[in-house]
Amino acid sequence: MEGGFFTADVLSVQRLRAGARDELLKWSKGTVYPASGTSAKSEVASLAIEEARKKIESLLPGGNIWFTSGPDEAANWAIKGISAAQRRKGSKIIAAPDSHLSILNAVRSIQGEEGVIASTASAINIETGVLLDIQRWEQNISENHPHARRIIDARGAIGRIDLAPLTRSSDVIILDSETCGGPVGVGALWVRKGVRIEPLIHGSGQENGRRSGTVPISLVCAFAAACIEAELKRTTNTKLWNKNHSQLEDAIRSIHGIIHGETEARAPGITCASIPGYFAEIRIQHLEERGIIVSPASGCSSTAGKPSHVLTSMGVDTDTAMRSLRFSLPEDTTSKDLKRLIEALQN
């Protein structure tokens, strides 16, 4: 709890882990030298960035990490970079209807009709927590589009699920920082070794010519620290999330709420629910007046006033979707915090 407020949806905020905060402060003091410079100070920065890269690559073996300004850029790079690299083989990319809008809009911007060159899927549906059936997805691609590249959006996956199946089943993985306790403004693209992908941003050739633009040392070092800490705490946090979210969902059912995706395998620590009564925007305001911060199902203000495209793609009617909220409880949620949230929802 901060300043009397309890944030019940950490996926929608920047909540820095201790290690990430330390790295952010460490590399924000005094004069910061660009890693691409030629001075000894720049060499220190370059080594720090490479160390951050290696830390994240240690969690995702078999590929290389290239830093971006965030997951939306990484998604656009994955879609457009693969499309450019595969243009002689076709122009069509398959995206699940419940994909993040950055995926859907990137696909729409370049979509062709000839030859499937890639298929995308989300490791975790970031709104409902529903997990991708990787084996089924992989089998479908192998049977119908055996030469298509496989792109997995792994937003929210670090520190919540085992990453090994993702690296075994994908050519490209989209990663974000803030959902694992790192800073906003940084993300990454994991590219399997040997997979060709064209640059999205052209310029001075940073990131070994793959992504131009000065690499923000403080952000990437904080991102890497958050990844390592989140993974180290994954087993412990999973137990806490399962316990707390089970109590929360029981309470929501007691007031005739609907838990979306409850019959499917879900990632720990994510609950999407539609609660009878007020539309989500009104309920969010009422909860904030009681010192509790939650988000609409999409977790994004840019879609406020609209039903979640994820929920409608699941067959949820517009009225129910407009009453949906997302909860992703902090790992340090206390019994007092949980009781306060449940009482606010029930009353």
Where are these regions (language model features)?
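Pyridoxal 5′-phosphate
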Residues: 1-347
